[in-house]
């Protein structure tokens, strides 16, 4: 990884013109795109509160944590903002297999002038810190404790990073930015949905300047997103179908909160359902293979009832079709 370390933002963009959000704020951006800049999704719909929080991270070097249920577009939100700013963006999935060595770096044997020599290869963290890069830690609440304490060193905006193996202190690039996404807010999982997440040290949570929540959207907003991705549904009949799909999803969310079911439909699931319905030309079958088959057998009849309420059609899993 060797992008131009001296590269820096050279233009300013209006948030109102770039993201369609009513704000007079301007944000630094790059005029040229590098290989680390994500591709722009022209159909992406931005959530106002989440967008303002993330842009504050870019504009004012704030550490921003985006928390919310699965499938709501947390990581994509950061990526799509970075794409429009031409800001290099690197995502790291902080699963349990990511170790300190992966982040910091390690000694490796390399050939130099025909001889084997030991050379320290920097990990993703030291490299990112020294470059104008937006580093995004996905699944932040699933990271191992030893890894989390490595990250804690760079959570302060002016915090230097010490490479003990090299007796070297790395200063942060002026345009290095740090973001993270998580399903929980660092207090552990009380829902049972997110196995593998854990409580986060509150001293570390305190270092995040901004914590924004991106959960399920209103029916109109969710429909806007799905229709933007599925333009063939942007007609009277298609809108009615998508509206009913979102109503089914809303019932699963209410059912989950009430304790009736243990699985919920995320906006991502609804999007997949809409896409699969166009593939199979069968809304009911698409619902079953997209979501229902992932659910507990005991709960399938309840979820099939949600479908029947919205679409007026029975599924094979419905109570009326179950033979005793």
Regions found by a protein language model. Give the residues of each.
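C-terminal engagement/docking regions of AAA+ P-loop ATPases
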Residues: 37-41, 280-324
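AAA+ P-loop NTPase catalytic core and its hallmark functional loops
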Residues: 1-239, 247
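Conserved AAA+ ATPase small/helical "lid" subdomain
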Residues: 216-218, 222-289
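Short flexible/disordered coil segments
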Residues: 156-157, 235-250, 279, 300-304, ...
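Short, hydrophobic/amphipathic alpha-helical patches that form generic packing surfaces
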Residues: 52-60, 271-276, 288-293
């Amino acid at each position: 990884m060797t992008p131009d370390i001296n590269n820096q933002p050279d233009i300013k963009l209006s948030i109102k013109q770039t993201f369609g959000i009513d704000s007079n704020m301007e944000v630094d951006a790059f005029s040229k795109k590098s290989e680390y800049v994500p591709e722009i999704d022209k159909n992406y719909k931005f959530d106002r509160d989440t967008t303002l929080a993330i842009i504050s991270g870019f504009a004012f070097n704030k550490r921003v944590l985006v928390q919310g249920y699965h499938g709501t577009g947390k990581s994509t939100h950061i990526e799509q903002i970075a794409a429009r700013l031409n800001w290099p963006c690197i995502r790291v999935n902080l699963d349990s297999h990511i170790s300190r060595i992966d982040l910091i770096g390690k000694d490796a044997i390399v050939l130099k002038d025909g001889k084997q020599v030991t050379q320290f290869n920097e990990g993703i963290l030291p490299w990112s810190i020294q470059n104008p890069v937006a580093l995004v830690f996905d699944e932040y609440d699933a990271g191992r404790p030893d890894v989390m304490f490595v990250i804690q060193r760079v959570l302060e905006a002016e915090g230097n990073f010490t490479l003990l193996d090299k007796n070297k202190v790395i200063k942060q690039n002026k345009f290095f930015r740090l973001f993270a996404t998580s399903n929980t807010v660092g207090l552990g999982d009380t829902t049972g949905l997110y196995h593998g997440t854990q409580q986060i040290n509150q001293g570390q949570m305190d270092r995040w300047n901004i914590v924004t929540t991106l959960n399920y959207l209103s029916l109109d907003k969710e429909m806007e997103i799905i229709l933007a991705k599925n333009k063939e549904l942007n007609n009277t009949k298609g809108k009615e179908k998508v509206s009913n799909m979102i109503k089914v999803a809303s019932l699963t969310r209410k059912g989950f909160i009430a304790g009736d079911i243990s699985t919920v439909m995320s906006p991502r699931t609804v999007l997949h359902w809409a896409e699969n319905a166009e593939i199979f030309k069968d809304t009911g079958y698409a619902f079953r293979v997209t979501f229902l088959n992932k659910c507990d057998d005991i709960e399938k009849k309840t979820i099939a009832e949600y479908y029947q309420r919205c679409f007026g059609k029975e599924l094979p899993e419905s109570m009326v079709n179950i033979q005793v």
